[in-house]
């Protein structure tokens, strides 16, 4: 098992690869045979397919991410990030508003043998997001 700092470095590397479009580099961060995403209810192949589909049909654009915290304890790494995007398509029944919205999101990864083997994520402040879309409330 890696140290908490090594585990955080692995998650940072995965996110950097994903953000830069380096799919092979991102995939190398996972144990493809053992990985399971609780958020996607899928193995690694299923998770990638769901992510591609969501990107194609994404009702938000011009997204930016601000990492507020990256914490490791044992084999778990937790990231708290603020996502800001422009609402450009229908989401939760709310037509595109053109508003800039921001919500906090949590991601949790479990690391084993220097690879990501489990993920819980996309834990978003949905009530806050809906309020921003529906009424234009913002931070």
Identify what each model region corresponds to.
Residues 84-113:
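Exposed beta-sheet edge and beta->alpha loop/turn motif
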Residues 1-2, 82-91, 139:
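Short, positively charged
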Residues 14, 63, 68-70, 106, ...:
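Generic beta-strand hydrophobic packing signal
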Residues 60-64, 111, 116:
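C-terminal-biased regions
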Residues 117-139:
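Low-complexity, intrinsically disordered terminal/linker segments enriched in charged
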Residues 1-29, 33, 137-139:
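Short, low-complexity N-terminal intrinsically disordered segments enriched in polar/charged residues
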């Amino acid at each position: 098992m890696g140290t908490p700092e090594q585990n955080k470095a692995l998650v940072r590397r995965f996110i950097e690869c994903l953000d830069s479009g380096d799919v092979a580099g991102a995939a190398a961060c996972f144990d493809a045979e053992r990985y399971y995403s609780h958020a996607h209810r899928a193995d690694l192949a299923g998770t990638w397919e769901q992510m591609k589909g969501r990107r194609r049909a994404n009702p938000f654009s011009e997204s930016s991410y601000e990492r507020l915290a990256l914490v490791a304890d044992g084999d778990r790494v937790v990231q708290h990030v603020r996502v800001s995007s422009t609402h450009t398509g229908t989401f939760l029944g709310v037509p595109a508003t053109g508003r800039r919205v921001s919500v906090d999101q949590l991601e949790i990864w479990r690391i084993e043998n220097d690879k990501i083997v489990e993920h819980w994520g996309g834990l978003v402040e949905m009530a806050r997001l809906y309020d921003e879309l529906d009424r234009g409330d913002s931070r």
